Amino acid sequence: RLADYKDEEIEDASFVIETPEDMLENFQTILDVVKAVLIGIAAISLFVGGVGIMNTMYTSVLERNKEIGIMKAIGARNVDVFLLFSIESGLLGVAGGLIGILLGTGLAKAVEEISRAALGQTFLQAYLSPGLFAGAMAFSFIVGVIAGALPALKAAKLQPADTLREE
């Protein structure tokens, strides 16, 4: 029987016998590597997106100095200005998250179709659950708020007299 010889190594063997379990283990290893690479890319994308939001919000604070001064002159508190800019940066994060989900889902569907065309059947199937979508949107909002915290703090600390005197 062949099973009796499965663990024996043959010198100068020109072939390899793999069981379905071996193939599944190799495939799982490949998927784990791909998953790690995708997580790395996602982390870099989040960092770059956060820096982009921070830059956008700093620019927004600079361009809206006079508006901030008027708001504070008519009674807006520091916390009001901080919340305004924090929510705005959170919404920028949500917009970026939505674009990312649309592009990611589109790419996953394309890979699914390409694998179906190349292999004749579907081995990979793209699926976006409502829970994952909601979690991604919430996480995007949080990343946006964190990225916009320093510009929002700067906006909140502006003095009305100084901002209205400028320009």
Name each model-derived stretch.
Residues 1-36:
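Mechanotransmission and gating elements of multispan inner-membrane complexes involved in transport
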Residues 12-16, 67, 125:
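Residues at or immediately flanking beta-strands
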Residues 22-38, 61-62, 91, 127, ...:
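Alpha-helical membrane-interface segments at transmembrane helix boundaries
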Residues 36-112, 135-143, 147, 151:
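Transmembrane alpha-helical interface segments in multi-pass membrane proteins
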Residues 59, 116-120, 155:
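Perimembrane helix-loop junctions in membrane proteins
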Residues 107-134:
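Short juxtamembrane loops and helix-capping segments at transmembrane helix boundaries
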Residues 152-167:
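Short cytosolic juxtamembrane segments of multi-pass membrane proteins
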